[in-house]
Amino acid sequence: MDKLLIEGGKVLSGEVAMSGAKNAALPILCASLLTSDPVHFTNVPHLNDISTMLRLLGDMGVGVTMDGIDGIVLNGGGLNNPVASYEMVKTMRASILVLGPLVARCGEARVSLPGGCAIGARPVDQHIKGLQAMGAEVKVEQGYVHAKATRLKGARICTDMVTVTGTENLMMAACLAEGETVIENAAREPEVVDLANCLVSMGARISGAGTDVIRIQGVDKLHGATHAIMPDRIETGTYLCAAAATGGDIRLLKTSAAYLDTVVDKLMDAGCEITVERDAIRLVAPKRLKAVSLRTAPYPAFPTDMQAQFMAINCIADGVATIRETIFENRFMHVNELMRLGANIQIEGNNAIVRGVDRLEGATVMATDLRASASLVIAGLVAQGETVIDRIYHLDRGYERIEEKLAKLGAAVRRVH
């Protein structure tokens, strides 16, 4: 199993390009199931979750062709097996995103209940409830969601909670439904908007993406299109935090601050200077960061996927910060590992109180989920001596070539097998 070795104490500087967003790419790849025409995607990140999704789509009969460095052409003309088996799904919860498109196009789907991250329960009941409202017959048996419908009917759906994958699944299904579907309490995330833009380029009729009410007028069929995946805002935020923690000066290319307002604001509160360009962001960090408190909540509030990284920078900041997690239970698994490096953190329910210390010291730590592992990398970059991070397959699920990108910015980091 791969490990990451980090020699701490190097200041990050220079330029590096960001990748396409995993959380936009996964649903957008599933959108190819809605048409028999080829769909061309660019700026697709090279990540384990993407490879898993492409294997899953291939198993269903979708033609997968690589095109250049970051391009993929998917052809759903040969779609003949609307099944997502446990073997394919167990490592990645996003595989539930095939459910809506399959029912809409094939009239049937069997999708194993998903695996993926270890950060608490993520029920698919909102997806099921929405499909039932659209006339699908849905059963959950032997660990599979089995859905059937001759043709889905437009419906008014109000989800019990804000769910990103639920919104995406139902929006895709509604594209081929008969009549109008209205999704209320819809997720407003930029990745939902990117998916909607892709679907519209394929001939879908969607309005309101990016607000909490999305309207979809069903059409008889969708066609091929070309779509560039949006930049990864969480990867961007993670590198900004890494530079901030090390007192660095970096410029991130092929990205946008448009969806990062809360993250940028918090980094400025911590004392960083940030310059936003059209397709780039520059951060200049102070000698020592100031502690910043935060509360996670659905977009456009502070993203839960940046919580662990901000905990890491607060570990060595001046002052005391309170971090309140309101999205997922069980999302403080990085705390014990950060404490092995010398952090001073106290958990009280869904709050973490972080008291900044003067220095962290390298140790062996274990990654427990994708964003937790990113926080350990940031802490390792500032810790004195060597930090060894075990189980970095979690990192590979969401960060493309992280050791190469960090090394380009001057970090002493290498992967060992």
UniProtKB/Swiss-Prot annotation:
Molecular function in Gene Ontology: UDP-N-acetylglucosamine 1-carboxyvinyltransferase activity
Binding site for phosphoenolpyruvate: 22-23
Reaction(s) this enzyme catalyzes, per UniProt: phosphoenolpyruvate + UDP-N-acetyl-alpha-D-glucosamine = UDP-N-acetyl-3-O-(1-carboxyvinyl)-alpha-D-glucosamine + phosphate
Annotated compartments: Cytoplasm
Pathway(s) this gene product operates in, as recorded in its UniProt entry: Cell wall biogenesis; peptidoglycan biosynthesis
Top enzyme class: transferase
GO BP, one annotated term: UDP-N-acetylgalactosamine biosynthetic process
Residues recorded as bearing 2-(S-cysteinyl)pyruvic acid O-phosphothioketal in the entry: 117
Disulfide bond as UniProt keyword: no
GO cellular component, one term: cytoplasm
Pfam families per the UniProt record, alphabetical: EPSP_synthase
The keyword Ubl conjugation belongs to this UniProt entry's keyword annotation: no
Main location: cytoplasm
Alphabetical keyword list: Cell cycle, Cell division, Cell shape, Cell wall biogenesis/degradation, Cytoplasm, Peptidoglycan synthesis, Pyruvate, Transferase
InterPro entries cross-referenced by the UniProt entry: Enolpyruvate_Tfrase_dom (IPR001986), Enolpyruvate_Tfrase_sf (IPR036968), MurA_subfamily (IPR050068), RNA3'P_cycl/enolpyr_Trfase_a/b (IPR013792), UDP_GlcNAc_COvinyl_MurA (IPR005750)
EC number(s) from the headed UniProt entry: 2.5.1.7
Binding positions for UDP-N-acetyl-alpha-D-glucosamine per the UniProt entry: 93, 122-126, 305, 327
Active site: 117
Role played: Cell wall formation. Adds enolpyruvyl to UDP-N-acetylglucosamine.
Family, similarity comment: Belongs to the EPSP synthase family. MurA subfamily.
This protein's name: UDP-N-acetylglucosamine 1-carboxyvinyltransferase
Lineage: Bacteria, Pseudomonadati, Pseudomonadota, Betaproteobacteria, Rhodocyclales
